[in-house]
């Protein structure tokens, strides 16, 4: 049940306009995950933004009532502006300010050399195997057989792995998201709608073979309270058995742009493949290993309910295991109850003033194009509060409104319209037999949108009222062309 919250319950955590990452985190976050995200996202994003000439220093991160919010940190000027800066000022600043001049050079070099290609090649030929070896080394240590001192050491090792993995994941966003944003941004300049442009990515996601999937990968979400494949029982749902048909955009773009279009589509498809692959290996797998170690600590410290351990930070668990004291079970239980209460709140999608985007056409062309790509990637990952459609055919069927994939497996009937807040890989088994998909969060390049394209099922993504408005058992029509979901008989 979602509890409507007054605006004052979610005060702005700082200057600027803050957007909630609801598609990734529909619930309030654990204490350790809050620390992890805040320590890795800003430096990782700053690295790629500097490398590729993005007109921002980084993303800042804040947690309000347990919910994660982000805001861009401007390259120069105040953190908060109530209106877009004058075009003449942007034109002058971008050509005279040393920071803008450096970013323009970086953007020009990136657009000429397209370095994300080399990064992607290196990932699949070298770096991927290195990360798999690192993960396997940690996985081969069974925490259940360790005494308290050795378990504390293992927790530290898991924490180091997770921290380095998340940092690398954010650094790679310049390579696994910007090319997708470039495709969408250029297509918009050619008059092609983003929903149509993103259809060219169908089939790009790499479906891993079951032998490549560790049972200790987190799969029902990103936080430490989520389950691994081993806890679900098997990895049968990891692959999406679809038959996608990518959209041929050439018929929508003038012939003189076809050569550039081919490059953009190829780069975006490789980027989508990189994003899905590195997210599992640098994020889901290390996080699952950390969860396993924390639950082992819970077996020693609170055997009546080992899952309370995920409410602690790694440092707090290490202190308890090494005899330094600290948290009590009462405090862990209080944290859990508070997190569940915060999860039930209707956290606003945005806090503070609307982001004041500078006029991109006042920037030097390389800076403007990279800026448009960054905005497109961000907007179509998170969504903008307006639903978007995937597919071309309407579908009518029984609605199943559910927020847990394990519950969905028991209640699901083939052909159902699955209605949920957001999806993760654990939904794949259900969605492979669904008639359509509706989510309350996300955009054109969210996990839900990608999965719908791979499966060839119609979807409406990012309808913020869907989970409240629709009811299980009702007959609904999903119309991806108009991005609407209607209950028949209303």
Region annotations inferred by a language model:
Residues 1, 399-416, 421-490:
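Acidic, glycine-rich flexible loop/linker segments
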Residues 368-415:
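Phosphate-handling DNA/RNA-contact segment within nucleic-acid enzymes
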Residues 21, 83, 262, 266, ...:
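Alpha-helical context
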Residues 2-388:
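Contiguous hydrophobic, helix-prone segments at protein termini
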Residues 61, 216, 384-386, 392, ...:
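Short, flexible coil/turn micro-motifs enriched in small/turn-prone residues
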